[in-house]
Amino acid sequence: KGGIYKEIGLKPNMVIYGKALGNGFAISAVIGNKKVMDVAQDTFVSSTAWTERVGFAAGLGVINFHKKNNVFVHNKKIGKQIKNEWLKLAKKHKLKIEVNGLDTIINFNFLYKNKNDYLITLFTELMLKENILANNTIYISYSHKKSIVSKYLNSVDKVFVRISSFIKT
C-alpha cells in the first residue's frame, strides 16, 4: 500500500525503502516517478550482493506478512491507544505531559520547567522496577499485542502515581 507518505498526503519524486523492508536482512528498494527513475536508470548501480538471494526472500516474506496481517493498521491502532492512555493517566494523576509523534513512533514529555530529562530518567528507572524497559518513546511493532500493551499501561499507571507524588514534594 506504500509508505507513510501516502498517509500524510505527500507525492515524493523518489522513495527509498531500506532495512525494514527485509526485517534487518540486506535489501532496499528505490521507487519514483518516471522522470526520476529514467535518470536513475542511467546512473544507479548497486551490485555489492546482487547474487545473494536471502535479502530478496526476506523482503518478499516481510511484504507478504504485512499484507496478510495488516501490520500498518495494527501498529497505528496500538499507537493511538497508548497515546490516549498516556493522556488519560497523566490527567488522572495530575501530571502535565504533551504527547507527540506519528501513531507508529510516539513519545511524551513532562511539562515541568527544566525537569523533563530528570523525570524521563525517573520514569525509566521506575518502569525497570516494574520489569519493563521503557522510556518516553515507543516504536510500535506488530509484537505489541493487547496483553503486552495492557501490562505496559498498568505499569505506567503505577509509575505516574510515584512521579506525581515526587512532583508534589
Indicate residue ranges for each PLM-predicted region:
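Conserved N-terminal phosphate-binding loop of PLP-dependent enzymes in the Aspartate aminotransferase
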Residues: 1-169
